[in-house]
């Protein structure tokens, strides 16, 4: 339940099977538990209604043809604990790729080349955060110019410098918060003029 956590993972098709298998193993090893436990990585969801919403996407994923490679279940009898979940064999037009699930889920989608990766990345109504991993600086410059997101991290996880601007594009909002942008976000600029001395107002007409 972190707004800037990416829920879609676009992976080059030539490494898709191996990469997602490794991600599945990592997902299975993540400790879910009480948020005050120092060993906990993922805590509970905030409310039973939201837990029900997140759990409902597991059935949707299967109905649309995706595979649940890890997780896909509620943990324990009490509390709103959901196992970290990886969806594979997914397409970008599936509900698990197009809708905000806001849970411990990741949808892995293959792409063939840079153009397809960009098209899939931008083919959603949201645009808060994006992450790009590449060894090619020219590609990084091209992609960050074209990605439709308010915040981007290149070869980095989400580490935000608080004075930097925060905000999204498209259905993820308008405006920026953070640093000097905070003042603009909460204020309306108004121009008020006062004469500094007496002056004659020009007479118009006869």
Question: Where do the model's predicted regions map?
Answer:
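ALDH superfamily catalytic-core signature
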Residues: 1-91, 154, 201-204
């Amino acid at each position: 339940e972190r707004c800037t956590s990416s829920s879609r993972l676009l992976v080059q098709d030539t490494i898709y099977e191996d990469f997602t298998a490794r991600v599945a193993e990592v997902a299975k090893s993540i400790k879910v538990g009480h948020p005050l436990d120092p060993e906990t990585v993922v805590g509970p969801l905030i409310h039973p209604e939201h837990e029900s919403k997140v759990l409902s996407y597991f059935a949707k994923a299967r109905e649309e043809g995706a595979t649940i490679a890890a997780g896909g279940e509620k943990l324990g009898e009490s509390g709103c604990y959901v196992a970290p979940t990886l969806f594979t064999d997914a397409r970008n037009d599936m509900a698990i790729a197009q809708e905000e699930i806001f849970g411990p889920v990741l949808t892995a989608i293959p792409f063939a080349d840079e153009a397809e990766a960009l098209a899939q990345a931008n083919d959603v109504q949201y645009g808060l955060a994006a992450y790009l991993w590449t060894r090619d600086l020219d590609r990084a410059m091209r992609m960050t110019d074209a990605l439709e997101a308010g915040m981007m991290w290149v070869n980095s996880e989400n580490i935000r410098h608080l004075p930097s601007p925060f905000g999204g594009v498209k259905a993820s909002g308008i405006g920026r918060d953070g640093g000097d942008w905070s003042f603009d976000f909460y204020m309306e600029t108004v121009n008020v003029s006062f004469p500094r001395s007496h002056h004659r107002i020009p007479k118009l007409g006869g």
